[in-house]
């Protein structure tokens, strides 16, 4: 894959992009998007530094098909392009970024292989939840923060950080 040229200025300029893969997140419950309860105060405080997408939907109801479509630029109505298209991470690597994948998803459960396939396109991968039963895993997404802070604090100038949340995957019991 040939290097991707920057279209927006000096390619030597330091840049950091953070992509949140928000499992089971519903924007209707995020105050950043107008929800009446104060659920995202830290994001709201830095709103001017963010690119907040207002009109985005998940292309599927399950993680792997959604990631295939989003990370491979697949069109909603067309077939899978996993064997023919480079992923977003591959393109970012080609553009000179150091890519990171930080996940709170359980890596040792059935179905985790599909997520790992995308994660392995990153130059550095960290799966922090080693549970064997995702339904019983109580691993809050805050466990990702120390790893994120470490990456943000390193000397790499051009970073693309993918953060894969556990979100609302926890088992609920009365």
Where are the language model's segments positioned?
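Active-site-proximal alpha/beta segments of enzymes that process anionic O-linked groups
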Residues: 1-19, 24-174
């Amino acid at each position: 894959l040939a290097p991707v040229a920057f279209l927006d200025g000096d390619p030597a300029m330091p840049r950091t992009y953070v992509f949140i893969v928000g499992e089971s997140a519903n924007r209707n419950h995020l105050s950043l998007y107008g929800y009446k309860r104060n659920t995202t105060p830290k994001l709201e405080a830095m709103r001017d530094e963010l690119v907040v997408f207002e009109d985005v939907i998940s292309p599927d109801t399950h993680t792997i098909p959604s990631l295939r479509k989003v990370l491979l630029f697949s069109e909603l109505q067309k077939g899978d392009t996993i064997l023919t298209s480079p992923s977003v991470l591959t393109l970012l690597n080609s553009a000179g970024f150091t890519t990171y994948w930080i996940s709170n998803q359980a890596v040792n459960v059935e179905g985790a292989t599909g997520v790992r396939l995308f994660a392995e396109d990153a130059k550095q991968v960290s799966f922090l939840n080693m549970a064997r039963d995702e339904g019983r895993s109580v691993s809050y997404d805050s466990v990702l923060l120390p790893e994120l802070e470490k990456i943000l604090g390193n000397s790499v100038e051009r970073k693309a950080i993918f953060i894969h949340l556990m979100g609302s995957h926890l088992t609920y019991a009365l």
